[in-house]
A protein has these predicted regions:
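Primarily marks secretory-pathway-exposed extracellular/lumenal segments that are disulfide-
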Residues: 2-150
Length: 150
């Protein structure tokens, strides 16, 4: 017979919980670094921007995009089109998505998205704004092992 040790069981669950907290995906764009995009497993594309956005384009890695709708792009009246793995969002009327954070758009996917690449974001005058894909480093500001910088 196997005998359960409650303390050991609680310790194991605590370790899994802490690992999940450290490496968990963001639940909204406000948790992310500035000027980043992130795609969730359900196809929500989060953003965090310090400038108003006049348009965006990116490729979805690992999946085919069947469609795009909603989010702050939809609320701003953007036309968001998807073809293959590429998503393009802009406004015919010159509308913008205000600086801030949230859900940029919601994608219908075929396959499992592993990230976004080829990210291009423009401000309202068409100038390119440097954006990257958000990757949580899990860095808590502590000491980096093997680092000897003073």
């Amino acid at each position: 017979m196997f005998k359960f040790n409650n303390k050991a069981l609680i310790s194991v669950f605590s370790i899994f919980f802490l690992i999940n907290l450290v490496f968990a995906d963001p639940t909204d764009g406000c948790e992310m670094d500035t000027n980043t995009l992130f795609i969730t497993s359900t196809g929500d594309v989060f953003y965090n921007s310090d400038v108003d956005m006049g348009g965006f384009q990116f490729d979805v890695d690992g999946a085919t995009v069947n469609g795009a709708s909603g989010g702050d792009a939809g609320a701003a009246g953007f036309t968001v089109s998807a073809g293959g793995s590429t998503v393009l969002g802009f406004s015919f009327s010159g509308a913008t998505i205000s600086a801030g954070c949230g859900t940029l758009t919601q994608l219908s996917l075929n396959g499992d998205a592993t990230g976004l690449s080829g990210i291009v974001v423009s401000d309202p005058t068409g100038n390119s704004v440097p954006f990257t894909y958000y990757v949580d480093s899990g860095d808590d500001g502590g000491v980096v092992e093997g680092c000897t910088d003073e």
